[in-house]
Amino acid sequence: MDFEKESRMMVEYQLKRRGISDEKVLNAFLKVKRHLFVPKDLERYAYDDCPLPIGEGQTISQPYIIGLMLQLLELRENDVVLEIGTGSGYQTALLAEIVRLVYTIERNETLAQRAKNKFEELGYKNIVLEVGDGTKGWTKEEIEFDGIIVSAAAPKVPEPLFSQLKIGGRMVIPIGSRTFQRLHKITKLEDGNMKVEYSDGCMFVPLIGEYGW
């Protein structure tokens, strides 16, 4: 297969034509090849507009949904971002192409090691990966993040994650039941309260942890 062509078509038809217009996000999708993050036997489906299984009961998300979440985050070049749910590492790599530094947490050790190996193979130096309960946020040190992206469904906003946002920081998270959610964009206001905006409906795997399911 011509993966380069498939990648360009994905960006044009699945992202641009559905309202993803942030050039930083579109350029990241062109640089990061999705087929490198899926199982070999599923490579031919890598650029289809659908989630794919990656093992351990987890999936790599639909390209459009990832693009939408990244666009909602309003990412800037100097941002420091926390990702909850490394999974295959695909979204992590997209983030790493856009922002200065990405911290990412994965609860499954097998997926975490696989993603870490992939980051090293591809030469990423601005990704810090830890295994743990992502609902608690980054516990290794005190950091305030410009953005937080959560790649699993929560019943509500986990308080530890909101507390780790900078004033003016943004979080994008699917919130709802175990079977259907809506993307929420959470902004931390000057007074410490949250502004909530609603986006598309979606279906993510449950966010497992102390402040999740």
UniProtKB/Swiss-Prot annotation:
Pfam families: PCMT. It is found in: Cytoplasm. It comes from the Bacteria. Its EC number is 2.1.1.77. One of its GO terms (biological process) is protein modification process. GO terms for cellular component: cytoplasm. One of its GO terms (molecular function) is protein-L-isoaspartate (D-aspartate) O-methyltransferase activity. Catalyzes the methyl esterification of L-isoaspartyl residues in peptides and proteins that result from spontaneous decomposition of normal L-aspartyl and L-asparaginyl residues. It plays a role in the repair and/or degradation of damaged proteins. Belongs to the methyltransferase superfamily. L-isoaspartyl/D-aspartyl protein methyltransferase family. This is Protein-L-isoaspartate O-methyltransferase. It comes from Petrotoga mobilis (strain DSM 10674 / SJ95).
